[in-house]
Regions:
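Hydrophobic membrane-insertion alpha-helices, especially the h-region
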Residues: 1-4
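N-terminal Sec/ER secretory leader and immediately downstream segment
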Residues: 15-118
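Extended amphipathic alpha-helical interaction segments
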Residues: 121-198
Length: 198
C-alpha cells in the first residue's frame, strides 16, 4: 500500500487559473508576483516530485512530475522575457540583475535531488534549493520596484518583445505535441503523450 496510497495522497495537479495575486504596491510587477507565487506553490506548498528517488511513493507518479516541470519551464521563460525589458539594478555592471539570477536558477534541471546523475553522482545543489533562490530573487526585484530603486516605464516595444518571446515558447510546445501525435498516433499505446501534454 505504501506506493499506491502514498502516490495517491501526494498527487496534486493544480490547473486553476483564477488567481488574483495582491500587490503591496502598485509600482510592483503583477507578472513577477504571479511567477513567484506559482514557483512557490509547486516547490513549497506541494512536494516537489520530479527529483525524488525510488524510495518515495511519488516515484511512480507520471503526470504530476511532468506538470511541475512544465510550470517551472514556463516560469523560467516568463522571467527570461521580463529580463529582456525590465531595467537592471543601479550599477548594473557590478550587481547582477536579480531577474537574470532568477532565470538562471529556474533553468536549473528539475530532477536533481542530492546528487547529479549528469555529473557522475557528484553532490549538487538540489532543484528545490535553486528554485527557492529564484523565488527570493523575484521577490527582491519587486521590492526594489516598490522602493523606487528601479523605475520601469512601460513602452509598446516592451510588450512586443514579451509577446514575441511568449509566442515562440507556445510554438515550440505546439510542435512538440504535433511531433508526438505524428509519430505515435498509430500505436496501440503511447505512454509519453500525457507527459508531453503536461
Amino acid at each position: 500500500l505504501y506506493y499506491p496510497l502514498g502516490g495517491w495522497i501526494i498527487n496534486d495537479i493544480d490547473t486553476n487559473t483564477d488567481y488574483e495575486i495582491p500587490l503591496s504596491d502598485p509600482k510592483q510587477s503583477a507578472t513577477i508576483a504571479t511567477t513567484s507565487y506559482i514557483v512557490n506553490r509547486e516547490v513549497n506548498d506541494k512536494l516537489w516530485t520530479p527529483n525524488l528517488p525510488f524510495f518515495f511513493p511519488s516515484y511512480f507518479l507520471d503526470n504530476m512530475p511532468s506538470f511541475q516541470l512544465g510550470m517551472i519551464n514556463t516560469a523560467a521563460n516568463t522571467a527570461l522575457a521580463l529580463s529582456r525589458v525590465m531595467p537592471p539594478l543601479p550599477d548594473g555592471e557590478n550587481k547582477p540583475n536579480r531577474l537574470d539570477t532568477a532565470v538562471e536558477m529556474l533553468q536549473y534541471p528539475g530532477t536533481v535531488w542530492l546528487f547529479s546523475l549528469e555529473n557522475n553522482l557528484v553532490p549538487a545543489p538540489s532543484s528545490t534549493k535553486q528554485y527557492r533562490r529564484a523565488i527570493r530573487q523575484l521577490n527582491k526585484y519587486n521590492q526594489a520596484l516598490s522602493a523606487g530603486i528601479i523605475v520601469f516605464t512601460p513602452r509598446a516595444g516592451d510588450l512586443k518583445t514579451i509577446l514575441a518571446l511568449t509566442g515562440g515558447n507556445l510554438k515550440r510546445a505546439n510542435l512538440d505535441l504535433e511531433k508526438q501525435i505524428r509519430e505515435f498516433s498509430s500505436s496501440w499505446f503511447d505512454g509519453k503523450a500525457d507527459n508531453v501534454f503536461y
